[in-house]
């Protein structure tokens, strides 16, 4: 938090009450979501994820036949179809007004505690379940009138969280590291904690009392004309996301390999991963990771920032389970949870720029 203060555009206008509220809300969310009395809720979510993965496998098996049956854990056949199915399901839940109901509850807390307008609260809360570009779409009519602080809240919340479809897709990649841990539970907790955190950092960097008009939820929720429209549009959006993820992974991994090849000419032991490990090791140590594990953890954090969370989590999942202690593995599960990377900045600028050209 202290590192953010020099970046503020108006240090004297910072509302310290909002910062205190944000920290208290994060502690409250963490206490509720990590307490034993919600175990049954997360157990139900875990079972739902297993059923969803199984159902997706049925569809993938029908389409690819023996290719999928011979290679069920190939990324393109395992993770990408899950993104498509989850996107379709999210659209359907939105049309049935189940997701808006949950999001409204979160946005109500943001409105009352942080004196935020309905649109930005709604958009920030939506990031817990949908992607960084989809969330601003829900409040598109209000974007052109939002203050810099409100836009920063939307963008920061988008980069600090991961969508429900990506959340479930990544959970399967980490089974090697967390055999007895409900990964989806921690992904959901990390995303929910990131919403008040995003508001806090925006309050520090762009303090402002400007509030947009109250959102008209009755009209703005009607994105789809019917259930079939939600299914088809949700599937199409999921396909676009899956194709983008696949394309970015191919390009990014190829570029990393090229950079490593060039660095290898200088020294056989030199690589982009090793450089990033030393750069981010102090940050990992500050997060509570022992110094003897900080360089390895820093490599993952650096890879996530330079490439994306998919590359980082895939690399994390491929490590030997004994490389990190249990504490370090859980810390890294939270630290890597978010769309924050250089490509996301471009995605957000182009996405929000297209929705509100001014």
What spans do the regions from the language model cover?
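Juxtamembrane inter-helical linkers in multi-pass membrane proteins
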Residues: 103-138, 211-230, 272-278, 300-305
């Amino acid at each position: 938090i202290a590192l953010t203060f020099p970046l503020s555009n108006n240090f004297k206008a910072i509302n310290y009450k909002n910062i205190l509220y944000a920290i208290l809300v994060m502690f409250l969310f963490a206490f509720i979501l990590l307490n034993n009395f919600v175990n049954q809720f997360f157990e139900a979510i875990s079972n739902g994820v297993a059923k969803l993965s199984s159902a997706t496998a049925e569809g993938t098996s029908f389409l690819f036949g023996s290719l999928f049956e011979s290679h069920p854990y190939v990324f393109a056949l395992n993770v990408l179809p899950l993104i498509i199915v989850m996107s379709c399901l999210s659209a359907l839940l939105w049309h049935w007004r189940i997701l808006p109901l949950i999001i409204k509850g979160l946005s109500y807390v943001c409105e009352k505690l942080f004196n935020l307008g309905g649109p930005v609260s709604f958009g920030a809360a939506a990031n817990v379940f949908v992607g960084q570009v989809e969330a601003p779409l829900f409040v598109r009519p209000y974007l052109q009138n939002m203050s810099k602080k409100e836009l920063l809240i939307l963008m920061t919340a988008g980069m600090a969280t991961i969508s429900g479809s990506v959340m479930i897709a990544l959970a399967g990649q980490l089974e090697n590291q967390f055999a007895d841990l409900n990964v989806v539970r921690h992904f959901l907790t990390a995303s929910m904690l990131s919403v008040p955190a995003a508001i806090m950092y925006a309050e520090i960097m762009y303090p402002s009392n400007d509030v947009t008009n109250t959102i008209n939820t009755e009209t703005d929720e009607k994105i789809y004309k019917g259930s079939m429209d939600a299914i088809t549009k949700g599937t199409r959006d999921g396909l676009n996301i899956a194709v983008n993820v696949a394309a970015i992974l191919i390009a990014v991994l190829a570029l990393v390999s090229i950079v490593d090849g060039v660095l290898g000419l200088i020294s056989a032991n030199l690589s982009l991963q090793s450089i990033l490990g030393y750069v981010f090791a102090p940050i990992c140590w500050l997060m509570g990771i022992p110094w003897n594990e900080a360089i390895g953890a820093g490599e993952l954090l650096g890879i996530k920032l330079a490439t994306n969370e998919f590359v980082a989590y895939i690399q994390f999942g491929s490590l030997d389970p004994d490389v990190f202690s249990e504490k370090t593995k859980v810390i890294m599960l939270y630290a890597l949870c978010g769309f924050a990377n250089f490509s996301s900045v471009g995605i957000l600028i182009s996405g929000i720029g297209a929705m509100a050209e001014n």
